[in-house]
Swiss-Prot record:
It is found in: Secreted. Its main location: secreted. Disulfide bonds join C2-C16, C9-C21, C15-C28. Expressed by the venom gland. It comes from Heteroscodra maculata. Pfam families: Toxin_12. Shows poor stability in cerebrospinal fluid and moderate stability in human serum. Half-life of the toxin is about 1.7 hour in cerebrospinal fluid. Half-life of the native toxin is about 10 hours in human serum. Negative results: does not inhibit Nav1.4/SCN4A, Nav1.5/SCN5A, Nav1.6/SCN8A, Nav1.7/SCN9A, and Nav1.8/SCN10A at concentrations up to 50 nM or 1 uM. Does not inhibit Nav1.2/SCN2A at concentrations up to 50 nM. Has no or very weak effect on Kv1.1/KCNA1, Kv1.2/KCNA2, Kv1.3/KCNA3, Kv1.4/KCNA4, Kv1.5/KCNA5, Kv1.6/KCNA6 and Kv3.4/KCNC4. Does not show significant effects on Kv1.7/KCNQ1, Kv10.1/KCNH1/EAG1, Kv11.1/KCNH2/ERG1, KCa1.1/KCNMA1, KCa2.1/KCNN1 and KCa2.3/KCNN3. Belongs to the neurotoxin 10 (Hwtx-1) family. 09 (HaTx) subfamily. GO terms for molecular function: ion channel inhibitor activity; potassium channel regulator activity; sodium channel regulator activity; toxin activity. The presence of a 'disulfide through disulfide knot' structurally defines this protein as a knottin. This is Delta-theraphotoxin-Hm1a. GO terms for biological process: envenomation resulting in positive regulation of voltage-gated sodium channel activity in another organism. Keywords: Disulfide bond, Ion channel impairing toxin, Knottin, Neurotoxin, Pharmaceutical, Potassium channel impairing toxin, Secreted, Toxin, Voltage-gated potassium channel impairing toxin, Voltage-gated sodium channel impairing toxin.
């Protein structure tokens, strides 16, 4: 199960599509993509 926006993460693979893991704050943030 993937993590949603602002969900805790250890790597981008933890996050849902279009989200990437912010290594400095350890949460999933939008990666700027739409497709």
């Amino acid at each position: 199960e993937c993590r949603y926006l602002f969900g805790g993460c250890s790597s981008t693979s933890d996050c849902c599509k279009h989200l990437s893991c912010r290594s400095d704050w350890k949460y999933c943030a939008w990666d700027g993509t739409f497709s």
